[in-house]
Design a protein with these regions (language model features):
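Structural recognition of the beta-strand scaffold that forms the well-ordered cores
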Residues: 1, 8-9, 62-65, 86-89, ...
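Active-site-proximal N-terminal segment of extracellular/periplasmic enzymes that hydrolyze or transfer
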Residues: 1-60
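Short, solvent-exposed loop/turn and secondary-structure capping segments
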Residues: 8-15, 66, 98-100, 135-139
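Phosphate-binding glycine-rich loops and adjacent basic patches that engage nucleotide phosphates
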Residues: 10-11, 67-78, 123
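N-terminal beta-rich core of secreted/periplasmic extracellular enzymes
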Residues: 57-71, 117-121
Length: 150
């Protein structure tokens, strides 16, 4: 799962609209040379090569709104912690309304899996955000979480 990416860049490559904004771009020509392409497919593969050359051929990429493939969260906040909770538990929780480091009271599918005898102590999480241990509730679940800063 990714977080903090705009669907436009994921599916269409470099955003020419943002290239016109001096507050976002220092060297437009270099960006176009490095990440541009004759097609959006070529541009997106230059911008996110691992996603398109490794993950996509072996998995599924959802959320291309230009093709009507809308993936929406149900929570009203549209930012990280509420979204991760929703994905990991299967439901939105309006009480989760910040990205603060608060132990998640909800049971995630990772915890359910870890409580299954076949998977006991075989579940772990790897992330790059220091709030993930709280979302998974590492303290309660005893699921090892490496959040990149540990």
């Amino acid at each position: 799962m990714t977080d903090g990416l705009r669907w436009q860049e994921v599916f269409q490559g470099i955003d020419s609209t943002l290239l016109q904004e001096p507050k976002f771009v220092r060297n437009k020509e270099k960006l176009l040379q490095t990440f541009g392409g004759k097609t959006s497919k070529e541009s997106r593969e230059k911008l996110l090569p691992f996603l398109w050359n490794t993950i996509a051929p072996n998995g599924q990429i959802y959320g291309n709104r230009a093709k009507g493939n809308r993936m929406n969260v149900l929570n009203p906040y549209w930012f990280s912690y509420p979204g991760y909770n929703e994905v990991l538990t299967g439901f939105a929780d309006d009480k989760i309304n910040s990205n603060d480091k608060i132990w998640n009271e909800n049971i995630t599918f990772l915890e359910t899996l870890n409580n299954n005898a076949s998977f006991k102590d075989k579940v772990a999480a790897f992330a790059t955000w220091e709030v993930i241990p709280y979302i998974i509730n590492e303290k309660r679940t005893n699921i090892p979480v490496n959040a990149g800063l540990e």
